[in-house]
Swiss-Prot record:
Keyword Kinase: no
InterPro entries found in the cross-reference section: GRIM-19
Main location (coarse class): mitochondrion
Function comment: Accessory subunit of the mitochondrial membrane respiratory chain NADH dehydrogenase (Complex I), that is believed not to be involved in catalysis. Complex I functions in the transfer of electrons from NADH to the respiratory chain. The immediate electron acceptor for the enzyme is believed to be ubiquinone. Involved in the interferon/all-trans-retinoic acid (IFN/RA) induced cell death. This apoptotic activity is inhibited by interaction with viral IRF1. Prevents the transactivation of STAT3 target genes.
Residue spans crossing the bilayer: 30-51
GO cellular component: cytoplasm; mitochondrial inner membrane; mitochondrial membrane; mitochondrion; nucleoplasm; respiratory chain complex; respiratory chain complex I
N-acetylalanine PTM sites in chain numbering: 2
Top-level division of the source organism's lineage: Eukaryota
A Pfam family assignment: GRIM-19
Name of the molecule in the record: NADH dehydrogenase [ubiquinone] 1 alpha subcomplex subunit 13
Location(s) in or outside the cell: Mitochondrion inner membrane; Nucleus
Keywords (A to Z) from UniProt: Acetylation, Electron transport, Membrane, Mitochondrion, Mitochondrion inner membrane, Nucleus, Respiratory chain, Transmembrane, Transmembrane helix, Transport
Length: 144
């Protein structure tokens, strides 16, 4: 068996040309320093705008508090007037209910004191409907 001669591929005469192996990426976008400067500038502007808004919000909050403080005596007087009206209506109802009970004193204080004690919700709304009592104790938070 005759061995066949293998022909090996060889470089062209004079060799191959030089191979360019460096990365040749095009420049894209801003440099790192300019992006850092833009980021810091954005942070400073955001901080400044938040401080400005917080000052405005604080000024509006102070204005609201001053308005509430100015209206507080009026609202307290309205609440006191409503409470006294309800107590008077309760005393009239108590007089009607307890008229046949001997030795019953209408409006006698259960606290045995001469000082003013704000009435409890149950005392004010004891003779009222359940809806009124629920509205007074829970406001608009109940859904029944």
């Amino acid at each position: 068996m005759a061995a066949s001669k293998v022909k090996q591929d060889m470089p062209p005469p004079g060799g191959y040309g030089p191979i360019d192996y460096k990365r040749n990426l095009p420049r894209r976008g801003l440099s790192g320093y300019s992006m850092l400067a833009i980021g810091i500038g954005t942070l400073i502007y955001g901080h400044w705008s938040i401080m400005k808004w917080n000052r405005e919000r604080r000024r509006l909050q102070i204005e609201d508090f001053e308005a509430r403080i100015a209206l507080l005596p009026l609202l307290q007087a309205e609440t006191d007037r409503r409470t006294l009206q309800m107590l008077r209506e309760n005393l009239e109802e108590e007089a009607i209910i307890m008229k046949d009970v001997p030795d019953w004193k209408v409006g006698e204080s259960v606290f045995h004191t001469t000082r003013w004690v704000p009435p409890l919700i149950g005392e004010l709304y004891g003779l009222r409907t359940t809806e009124e009592a629920l509205h007074a104790s829970h406001g608009f938070m109940w859904y029944m």
